[in-house]
Structures are given as C-alpha cells and as structure tokens.
Amino acid sequence: MNNLNNLRRVSYKDFEQNAFNPTWSGWKTLIEIEKKLKPSKYYSDPISHMYLFLNNYWLEEAVRKALDLSYKSNDHMAIYDYSGLNMPDFVDDNGVTYELKQGKSLESLELIAEKDWHGCKVKLFYSRMDKCLYSNAGGAFNWHKLCSLDIKHINPDKGLKLKDIVL
C-alpha cells in the first residue's frame, strides 16, 4: 500500500467546511488530485467530480456509525493523490468484511460487477431513492433493508464549478 503520509491530500473535514468557498486554498490541491483520478462518468467539471467524493464520505461515515464498523484501511478520512485500494470498505469486531455501494435504486445493483465487491462477506447498498441501507450476505438477490439513513448531499449541478474558483 502507498505510504499515505507522502501523498498530497485534502481532508474531508476541510473540504466539508469549504465546499462553497470559492477562495479556499484547498481547491488547488483538490484540482491537482482530480486530474490523476479516473475520470468521472457523470461530470466533466473537476469540482463537480470532487463533490461526489464528499457525498460518498458522508455516506460512509453514516454507515460506519449506524452499523458500528471500522474502516478496513486508513484512506477514508481524506482525498488522496492515488487510486483507492481493492479491498472492502469496512470490517466488524469479528473480522467480517463489508463493501458499500450506492445507486439511485435497487435496480442499480445490476450495474455493479462482482469484482467491485472486493470479496467482502457482506454487501451493503444505499438506495438514494428511498434513503435506505440494504445488506446481502449471500444469494443473487437476497437484499434486506437494514435502516433508513438521511445523508448529507451536495448536488454537483448546484455547487461551485471550476470557473467559480479563485486559484
């Protein structure tokens, strides 16, 4: 694994506090990091792309707290200058691994390749439509609702754009 201390990074807490501040000094680093990441399927604007990362952080934090899980790796508190690890997101006290995905609805599950679950024991899926977290510990479509979660969210279409940022 990469030594995270030697990488450029922006903490999610700093990003959260400055997400609508066009003069924030962290934008320069975020834009440099975004250039090294896999391009967004949804947004060509780098700032819109970065809002997706912040939204995902808020979801991961809510799930971690709701299910009393720990992060499997130490790369979940900041956006780093490298691609993520191919391992599950979470682990519980018994060593059971969990991977979290999200989509508009349960129908979105059809778009997630098995390899993207990273060999986890428990699959977690957050449906943005009904704001519910589901789990599947086996079986093709054996999903069970765990809980409702109202997650903070920035609509990237309504946030800042690169043209708004003062570098």
Where in the sequence are the language-model features?
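Nucleic-acid endo/exonuclease domains
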Residues: 57-82, 104-106, 131-133
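Charged phosphate-binding loop/patch that engages nucleotide di/tri-phosphates or the phosphate backbone
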Residues: 150-167
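Catalytic cores of nucleic-acid endonucleases
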Residues: 100-149, 153
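Active-site metal-binding core of divalent-cation-utilizing nuclease and nuclease-like domains
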Residues: 45, 73-93
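Interdomain/boundary linker segments immediately adjacent to catalytic/signaling cores
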Residues: 1-66
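Conserved catalytic cores of phosphodiester-cleaving nucleases, focusing on short active-site segments
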Residues: 67, 90-102
